Amino acid sequence: MALTSDIVESWHSPRRVVRRLRGAGRSEPVVFTFLFVFLLLAFVSLAPYLSRQAALNPDVTLYQRLFGAGLGLLALVPFFYLLAALGHLVARLMGGTGAFYDGRLALFWALACSTPGMLFLGLVRSFMGDGPAVTGMGLGLFVAFITLYSLMLREVEGQ
């Protein structure tokens, strides 16, 4: 299936989708692509807010803000790999039987599935600025991500 169709399906059947992705065979480039899609769309979701901030405070240009955000997101790549390994090790302590690859698949796919919410959050944040509504939306998105990740990790670890 297409990536977008799988993302939509993951919101109502995350275990089935991650099972299908795992059954398609082990492919590190595919898993890295999921992480890259997340990072790219995270960058896109930040752009409207950074544009607003550049208009409100022209001391730092939009290009400088975008460059900093892009470098910051790229710097997170090793962190996500470590987070996936930690998730796998915790699952292993709880009786999981998967491999480190399965932990990466679960985390990176859950991150990719959270991108529609991130894009919406970025849009709202660019219109409203920071405030309680944006904080509440961010918290809701975080809870949705944790739910997706825990269900997917549980599936790939065989629990």
Residue ranges and their predicted role:
Residues 47-72:
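Membrane-helix boundary elements
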Residues 26, 59-62, 129-132:
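Juxtamembrane loop-transmembrane helix junctions in multi-pass integral membrane proteins
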Residues 41-47, 114-119:
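A generic, lipid-embedded transmembrane alpha helix
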Residues 43-53, 78-84:
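Transmembrane alpha-helix/helix-exit interface in multi-pass inner-membrane proteins
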Residues 1-42:
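N-terminal juxtamembrane cytosolic/stromal segments of multi-pass membrane proteins
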Residues 65-74, 80-159:
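Hydrophobic alpha-helical transmembrane segments and adjacent short intramembrane/lumenal linkers
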Residues 2-14, 58-66, 95:
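Juxtamembrane loop-helix boundary motifs flanking transmembrane segments in multi-pass membrane proteins
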